[in-house]
Regions:
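Hydrophobic, lipid-facing positions within transmembrane beta-strands of outer-membrane proteins
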Residues: 3, 46-50, 89-95, 155-161, ...
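Outer-membrane beta-barrel translocator domains and adjoining extracellular loop/strand segments
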Residues: 16-23, 29, 69, 73-80, ...
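Gram-negative outer-membrane beta-barrel transporters
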Residues: 8-11, 32-120
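Short sequence motifs at beta-strands and strand-loop junctions characteristic
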Residues: 40-44, 83-89, 147-156, 203-207
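Outer-envelope beta-barrel architecture signal
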Residues: 1, 58-60, 89, 105-111, ...
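Extracytoplasmic loops and strand-loop junctions of Gram-negative outer membrane beta-barrel proteins
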Residues: 29-37, 74-78, 139-147, 193-197
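C-terminal beta-signal and adjacent terminal beta-strands/loops
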Residues: 115-138, 152-156, 163-217
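Membrane-embedded beta-barrel scaffold of Gram-negative outer-membrane proteins
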Residues: 1-33
């Protein structure tokens, strides 16, 4: 069994920001912008990573890891905010078991499970008045309180069940993999609902099951 603890602190300087605004490229997943930027922003990440791991022994292994962190930035207005990605915590649990089967115990039945619990994404409060006044009802946000709101935590679950048949010159592996069997939802922002006159959360849950066969020789 192995325990590892890693604290860290990171400072970012000369980050491109928009003058007199909460905008910073630290919150962007793409870097296409139309407005002029200045290198006067800053960023700060503080956290600790903890990992407890048992290596494979007697067909069993597991790992539990957790990250507690605080991620903030200073915009072009000189104010410190949460970054978009400041979930505050991520906890992972991974466990697997193998059984040796067959006449000569040469085949392997394997079951693996991974669960991830993490804080929700950050978003800015909705400016309802500005949204209603927008000609296309495009949702507007109060950027003076950038990323002060947070979606609900997410629980993501994945599993794999496989059976490997080992022969002298060839091996066969049958596997079933399930991704996000817990139905966790990804959030993509908000949109105005013309029918109800309300502003709804835009989200989606993708659950995948993959059946595979692999031949090795």
């Amino acid at each position: 069994m192995n325990l590892k603890i890693e604290p860290y602190i990171q400072f970012l300087h000369d980050v491109p920001v928009m003058a007199d605004s909460s905008y910073s490229v630290l919150n962007r997943s793409d870097f296409y912008v139309e407005d002029a930027l200045v290198n006067k922003g800053r960023g700060r990440n503080i956290g600790i990573d903890i990992t407890l791991e048992r290596f494979l022994e007697k067909g069993l292994y597991y790992m539990i890891s957790g990250s507690l962190f605080d991620s903030r930035y200073r915009g072009g207005d000189g104010v410190w905010y949460n970054t978009k990605f400041n979930r505050n915590y991520v906890i992972n649990g991974l466990i697997g078991k193998e059984w040796m089967l067959g006449r000569n115990r040469q085949n392997i039945l394997s079951i693996n499970l991974k669960l991830t619990l993490q804080g929700g994404d950050r978003y800015s409060p909705i400016d309802r008045e500005a949204t209603m006044n927008h000609p296309d009802k495009e949702v507007q946000y109060d950027e003076t309180k950038a990323f002060s709101k947070q979606y609900s935590p997410m629980l993501i679950g994945n599993y794999t069940v496989s059976y490997r048949i080992n022969k002298k010159k060839v091996s066969h592996e049958f596997a079933v993999k399930g991704l996000n069997f817990t139905g966790a939802k990804e959030h993509y922002g908000h949109e105005y609902n013309v029918k109800t006159g309300k502003i709804d959360v835009s989200d989606n849950s993708t659950i995948l099951t993959n059946v595979s066969y692999k031949l090795e020789f």
